[in-house]
C-alpha cells in the first residue's frame, strides 16, 4: 500500500538483475538513461556507489541550466536492492531527502523491477516525479533488454 506522497512503479525487464543493477551504478549507463528525453543531456558529477557514498547528476535540456539530483546510498545489496536518498533542485517543485528504493528480482529469466520513491513533501511533488520515472525506466529497459 502506498500513501499520497509515495510513488510505486513495477516493470518486467528482459534482462538479468545483474545487468539492470549495473545501469543504476555505472557512470556511462546513468548518463544514457538519467534524462527526460532525447533533447536532454545528463552528466554524472559524483558517483561513489557504497553505503554512505554519494551521487550527483546534472540533467536537463541541452541549452539550459541543469536540474540537479543528489543523495547518499543508504543500502546496497547487489544485484537485488539499492536504496538512496534523493534531493532535486533547479525545478519548479524541488524536493529534499526523499527516499528511492529499487528492488530487482529474477522472474522467469527476466527482472521484476519495483521502484518506490517516498517521502515527497506533497502529492504534487509525487505527481511531478511520476512524470519522469517511467521514461527513465523505458530508457533503462532499452539499454539492457535482450529482445531489443
PLM region spans:
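Beta-strand/loop substructures that line and gate deep hydrophobic ligand-binding cavities in soluble
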Residues: 83-134
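A generic structural micro-feature
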Residues: 3, 47-49, 63-67, 92-96, ...
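Hydrophobic pocket/interface hotspot
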Residues: 20, 30, 55, 73, ...
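Charge-dense, helix-prone N-terminal extensions
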Residues: 4, 10, 18, 45-46, ...
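Short amphipathic alpha-helical signal-transduction/dimerization elements
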Residues: 25, 137-148
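Hydrophobic ligand-binding cavity/cleft-lining segments
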Residues: 1-41
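A short, structured loop/turn motif at beta-sheet edges
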Residues: 17-18, 49-50, 74-81, 103-112
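Glycine-rich portal/gate segments that line the openings of hydrophobic small-molecule binding cavities
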Residues: 42-87
